[in-house]
Design a protein with these regions (language model features):
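N-terminal secretory signal peptides that target proteins for export/translocation
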Residues: 1-8
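C-terminal motif of bacterial Sec signal peptides marking the signal peptidase cleavage site
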Residues: 23-26
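Active-site catalytic motif of lipid deacylating hydrolases and related acyltransferases
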Residues: 61-149
Length: 242
């Protein structure tokens, strides 16, 4: 299993860099159905069991695509136009992983772009809506689809923000952590405080590590702070080409 996990990590490492560069460029719909019913419906997944006969599974979380131009703070599950952008963003990432993994990518009520201009307290209710959708989808996937297979987790931007929350909540349990190949939290800051508060989180130190987080960010020369890396903040990363 360890050799299989390591091989999957090597396959995706180089591809991540190029796709990451490409990607860098108050009405809420409620889910009324229980999660088993809601995410058992294929239409609530952008990709469900995409690909066959692969070495692992991939649970992929979409980045922010809803600009909130309608005044909404979470994406509506009925917004077909934004769902097209949602799938388009996933298509920019899927090529990194699809040769190695069967892909699962749920639609979720992601936070819209204006939410990132809010304070942490103001953001919290919209973040909770987005995260609970992702967590519900993950629970459905794991209980009904995983069947003991190695698991890759991946996200970018908001997708990585939610993925980090998922890792904190679930992956202290060997039921989940023993399946983890790696978690690709690209384009979101992971700090020493995160690791200190959740010691089961492990950052990758080399190409053969498994069960670890792989994370990095890029900033233009001269940039001293950003949404991802606020002033005075140090984030953890690994060079994906090492």
């Amino acid at each position: 299993m360890i050799n299989s996990k390591s091989r999957v990590i090597r396959i995706v490492a180089l591809a991540i860099v190029s796709v990451f560069i490409l990607l860098c460029c108050a009405c809420v719909q409620e889910k009324d159905e229980p999660i088993v019913e809601y995410y058992s419906k294929i239409e609530n997944w952008a990709y469900y069991a995409e690909g066959e006969d692969k070495a692992a599974d991939l649970f992929l979380i979409c980045p922010t695509v809803d600009m909130g131009k309608g005044g909404n703070y979470n994406m509506s599950m009925d917004d077909t136009k934004t769902k097209e952008s949602f799938v388009g963003a996933l298509n920019m990432e899927r090529g990194i992983y699809e040769d190695s993994a069967i892909m699962y990518a749920p639609y979720y009520r992601q936070m819209t772009f204006p939410v990132y201009n809010m304070t942490a307290d103001e953001m919290q209710p919209y973040l909770e809506i987005a995260y609970r959708d992702v967590a519900d989808a993950f629970e459905y996937y794991f209980e009904n689809c995983n069947n003991g297979r190695p698991l890759i987790l991946a996200g970018f931007s908001q997708g990585s923000q939610l993925l980090l929350m998922l890792l904190k909540e679930y992956f202290d349990d060997p039921k989940y952590s023993e399946k983890l190949v790696a978690a690709y939290c690209i384009g979101w800051g992971i700090t020493e405080d995160d690791i200190a508060q959740f010691p089961h989180l492990k950052m990758a130190q080399g190409e053969d590590d498994t069960g670890v987080i792989i994370s990095f960010n890029t900033e233009a020369e001269g940039i001293e702070e950003s949404l991802i890396v606020p002033a005075g903040t140090k984030t953890l990363a690994i060079n994906p080409l090492n």
